Amino acid sequence: MTQRRAMLILHGKQALNEDVRDAVADKRKQGWELDVRLTWEAGDARRLVGEALAAGHRHIVAGGGDGTLRDIAEALALAETQASLTILPLGTANDFARAAGVPLEVSKALQLMDVAPRAVDLGEVGGKLFLNMATGGFGSQVTANTSEDLKKVLGGAAYLFTGLTRFSELHAAHGELTGPDFHWRGDLLALGIGNGRQAGGGHELCPTALADDGLLDISILPAPQEVVGTLRSLLEGGLGIDNMFIRTRLPWVELKSAQGLDINLDGEPLSGEDLRFEARPGALQVHLPADSPVLSRAPMLNRPD
């Protein structure tokens, strides 16, 4: 059997994960030469990707959460390599993996190493790359003291509003978004710019996004003139806020906000008053299920090893 080589770059907190240890042993029995390296601090993922490529590896496995996945995907894209990526979701949210249909069971996720890779896009902003989504709002995760009423009415945008306990605490940011044949300006409560579909642990801000269409899905949650009253009316009427989103797909979009807007790139913070988001089509080869919901195009022929 021809031996196949890969490097698993594993988040340091997963070093003692017995499921990972067993699955790695199984892959080795199947003929894989699978090296394992651990991340410890910021910058390790990029360094380890560089070491893997220098050692001749053409296949990287990202073992961790959405942040680890973003770091490794960015490093591979910046290296301008045709090395491919398998996703081993070990985080809390695993948003891109879940939306893409990647199994959460370790052994099943590693079975994708034997599936032909597909070309997927990345998003780029401010010199940073992201695989899943850029979100803007009032925080990156919902907290325990966010009231259940607020969670119910905010729906997919709930996690953007950190620590809010009353409708009266909501406030909007003024922003302007411009792209090809698209212009929107006004007050917004939340924003999602997605290559993937969900963020914050399963909240679908861009529910129909495709990772291989060369486009970014834009979801804007505009702020009604009377925020508190409108949200209360929606809640009392049994409706959520998801149907208020303005959505479009663009190859690029420029975001301007005089007071600045805090952006979260799969866990990586970014802020600015003038940001340009672009899709980088086919920037990464990723091993995904053949029926992955985020894929649209027919699979490419297998590349020779």
Swiss-Prot record:
Molecular-function GO term, any one: lipid kinase activity
Cofactor(s) this protein cannot do without: Mg(2+); Ca(2+)
Residues involved in Mg(2+) binding: L210, D213, L215
GO biological process: phospholipid biosynthetic process
Domain of life of the organism encoding this protein: Bacteria
Any coiled-coil regions, as ranges: none
GO cellular-component term (any): plasma membrane
Catalytic residues identified in the record: E268 (proton acceptor)
Entry keyword Transcription: no
Enzyme's top EC category: transferase
Cellular location(s): Cytoplasm
Chain sites annotated for binding ATP: T39, G65, D66, G67, T68, L69, R70, D71, T92
Principal subcellular localisation of the protein: cytoplasm
Residues of the DAGKc domain: 1-129
Keyword Cytoplasm: yes
Protein name stated in the entry: Probable lipid kinase YegS-like
Organism: Pseudomonas savastanoi pv. phaseolicola (strain 1448A / Race 6) (Pseudomonas syringae pv. phaseolicola (strain 1448A / Race 6))
